[in-house]
Amino acid sequence: NALKIDWETIVPKDRLSYIIGNPPFVGSKYSTPEQKKDMDVVFSPYTKKYRKLDFVASWYLLASKFMEGTSIKSAFVSTNSIMQGEQISILWPLIFDMGNEIDFVYKSFIWNNDANLKAHVHCIIVGFSSTSVTTNKVIYDNGSESKVSNINAYQIKAENIFIESRNKSISGAKPMIAPNKPCDYNHLKIEATEYDDFIKSSPESAKWIKRMVGAKEFIQNKERYCLWLVGITPKELRSMPIVLDRVEKCREARINANTSESLKLANTPTLFREQLNPDKYLIIPCVSSERRKYVPIGFLDDKTIPVMGTLIVPDATLYDFGILTSNVHMAWMRTVAGRLEMRYRYSAQIVYNNFPWPKVTEAQKEKISKTAQAILDARALYPESSLADLYDELTMPVELRRAHQANDKAVMEAYGMTKVVDGKKTWLTESETVARLFEMYEESTKN
């Protein structure tokens, strides 16, 4: 077991030049009890948060410790999540504090297991060594390579800054919150295929039914409904036997689940766990395809109930929408967000709350509000198209693309993200944009 033995008993440091390999691909949620014990031994002297790390992180820490004071170089094929989202700020400060730097990174690719064609893992290859060993760093990405002065844990050319999980926006932006969690065991939900029959059998129930939207329903324009019984009287409930039956089954399911939370919720069987129903809000899907340039976000009102798989910003404005749907925010999201396989995993704690908003004039704010409205207007030209179709790079309408480009320019101007090349004003590249945002983040959080 490589995590239990003293590596120097196998090869003395002074006889070793390289440590390379592909340690086991095991995500943090899938580690066996034995693997968890191994990680306890490796990480407990350094951090208490290691249970959120993938198993492969153990090899990174042991190699870093082993290489101290040597010219040894290490490289591992790894699950890509060790350089995504929350894991970054747990693992990589430990490695850098031991005097190591990233020498190269080969960005995400799929590792297929020939023995089991269903087994494929999204991987990266990371090379690292003492700060004094390698001066030329290289980023390998989609067939290209970039030589840079420093590679940080977000796989970009930037200083070694770490994005911490936060409960509030560093810029004072409106709170982004989790939506409703029904905890109804599907008894308060009404599928699209059930809706017509449900209404026919109980026409008076229509006033108590609202559309329910998770990420799939929002992006793919799928219809799904729920009983939203906030404020219903006992008399009204008893007048609708089909609704009362659903409520009774919800109560029974919560009791049978027999957890402290479900038993408490059994006392309110007419209700979801939360009763969030804002008049107007922005909705953001938590997981979205990496093939999209823009994560589809949009406005909904109190006729629609947001549920798990999304995040919401109540009382958001057009200006808020313009900033969040811009290429600036998307560049930030692509860099700091976690991933599900390769799909973006948007979070309030990492992506939204750490995002540096610009300091804008009223004129800039008004301009961004107008370009944001133009995006909504362009979508409205295609009422039969889902956001999945509108934001597919192959089928995105030209009006929508142009509206986004105009919004991108307005937002970049507000950030001052322009430069002069050959006497002409142009925009920062995505990597330059992210580097600037990291500088803004550091400035906002240094105190």
Residues of each region from the PLM?
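Conserved acidic residues
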Residues: 1
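Signature of N6-adenine DNA methyltransferases within the class I
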Residues: 4-203, 220-221, 234-238, 301-310, ...
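Non-catalytic DNA-recognition/assembly elements of restriction-modification systems
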Residues: 242-250, 357-447
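Short coil/turn segments at secondary-structure junctions
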Residues: 46-47, 231, 394-398
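Active-site-adjacent structural elements in folded domains
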Residues: 60, 337-342, 393-399
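Polybasic, glycine- and aromatic-enriched phosphate-binding surface used to engage nucleic acids
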Residues: 57, 133, 142-370, 443-447
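A generic secondary-structure signal for well-formed alpha-helical elements
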Residues: 23, 27, 67, 71, ...
